[in-house]
C-alpha cells in the first residue's frame, strides 16, 4: 500500500515541464516506446497484418499523447484526496453492512462511495482548475495541433491571431465557469456528509 502511494506521488516530486519532456522522449518517433516495439517485432507484425510500411508508430502530436500527458500529470491530484478519505473510513460500517447481508457491490455503492465522495469532489476540483487552463502539455505533446482552452487564450495574446479583447473575454468566461463548477462541487460535497443508508 505504501509502495503504491509512493509510486503515485513520485511524479509530483519532479518539475511539471520535466515530466512532460520525459513523455516526449518516450513517445517520439525514435523514442523508447518505438524502440521497444521494433525490438519485440510489433511494428513488423503490424506491417505484415495491415500491409503498411511503417518504420515507427506515430504517437507524438496526437490527441492521445495530450490525454496521456494530462492524465499522468494530474492523476496524483485526484488519487491523493480519495486515498486520504478512504483510509479514514470506519471499517465497522463495512462489517455492519456485510453482517446485514449486503454484497460487495452494495457495500461499495451504499457505504464506501457516499463516504468517499468528499475526497472525489476535492480531487475533481484540484484537477479541473489546472487542467482547464493548461497549454504547455498540448503544445509539447500535441505539437500545437490539439488546442485546449489555454492554447486558445495564449494565442490571442501572444500568437499570430493577436486579439487581446477576445482573449480577455474567453479568460473571464472560463473563470466564471470554473467558479460555478467549484461552487456546485462544494455544495455537492457538503450535501453528501450525511448518514449512510443501508
Report residues per predicted region.
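Generic alpha-helical transmembrane segments of integral inner-membrane proteins
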Residues: 7, 71, 124, 128, ...
